[in-house]
Amino acid sequence: LPLDLPGVVAETENGMPGRSHRTMLAPIVSSPRALSVVTKYWMKKYDRKPDFIVAEGPLAGGHLGFKREELDAYTPENYERELTAMIRQAAELGIPLIAAGGIYDRRDLEHCLSLGAAGVQLGTRFVTTEECDAAEAYKQAYLSARKEDIVIVKSPVGMPGRAIQNAFLEKVAAGERFMTG
């Protein structure tokens, strides 16, 4: 959790004479408990609330803020209860909440808004756009991927991550090491 982010940003802002605005901060959380821990800590230690909160669900791409067993136990109904609880918590604090993770189309967007989210964040959906500076081969991997190609891997930080099955992941699974030093 980004518990000390306000302190890091304050140090940077204090070193910039003439700066007349503060940096907006938006922690990414994955549960009502994480939202509570971050907001209480920030308010107590830094007298600062997040400008908005991103609640990232278990269907997100990339690194995930969930344990493997939490992903295995995921159901849309369970997560909707969690998201609704986070929306309620954030509203009580006067903080807008942005829903993220697994938002695929307009129906998903409208559903999140109907639950009370202030907005949605999409990431994976934009990887293949012209504006994204990813390599064409990387974009093509997304476009060519089938549902069964999407796998859960253990990220370098030990948390689960969602990835497209490829030769690199197969080498990692076989025990090949890529880091030196």
Feature roles, as predicted:
Residues 1-93:
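Active-site entrance/lid segments in N-terminal catalytic domains of soluble metabolic enzymes
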Residues 50, 58-98, 104-181:
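Conserved active-site-proximal phosphate/metal-binding subdomains
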